[in-house]
Design a protein with these regions (language model features):
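Glutamate identity and glutamate-enriched acidic tracts
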Residues: 1, 21-24, 62, 96-98, ...
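Short secondary-structure boundary/capping segments
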Residues: 4-5, 23-24, 61-63, 75-78
Length: 157
């Protein structure tokens, strides 16, 4: 899959997938909206809280590496050569994730590669390119308006 992600601390994210099909994930820090235009469906869930250790909290700076994770050096298969790899296991077991693997650029410490293994054995891999930091996106970018004519599924978590 291919797309863009914009992250703003604390807890705000917008993931826009453009290929192979469009889908959108938006968090305003309180609620997460997962929009699937082809299915005419929006899933609405509470955003993770400080008690969680999801990849989202890690990326938005809400998780604390030392407090929340046990870290170990790791070679990440498929990651670009030269990245520093860390395997992160939550100190408090997360109901959804086994571990995260992070590939960090040793020059500027940007996260370039992220792998999340869920409790069902599913693996999600993200490769970040063309990173731009300190862009100060407007808060309105993280507001989601539910389109007319879609089914809304609410998850209590």
């Amino acid at each position: 899959e291919r797309g863009t992600v914009v992250i703003k601390r604390p807890g705000r994210m917008r993931w826009l997938y453009t290929a192979p099909e469009r889908k959108e994930f938006v968090s305003d820090g309180v609620t997460i909206y997962a929009y699937f235009p082809a299915d005419k469906q929006v899933m609405v869930s509470p955003a993770p809280t400080g008690a969680d250790t999801t990849p989202a909290l890690f990326l938005t700076g809400q998780a604390n590496l030392v407090r929340d994770f046990t870290a170990a050096a790791l070679d990440i298969p498929g990651a670009a050569a030269g990245l520093l790899g860390l395997k992160l296991v939550a100190k408090q077991p997360d109901p959804d994730f086994e571990w995260l693997a992070v590939g960090v650029d040793p020059v500027n410490y940007q996260i370039r590669h992220l792998v999340a293994l869920d409790r069902q054995g599913g693996r999600s891999t993200f490769v970040f390119t063309d990173l731009k930091e300190n862009q100060r996106p407007p808060d309105t970018l993280f507001a989601f308006r539910i389109p007319k004519g879609v089914d809304v599924i609410t998850n209590a978590r």
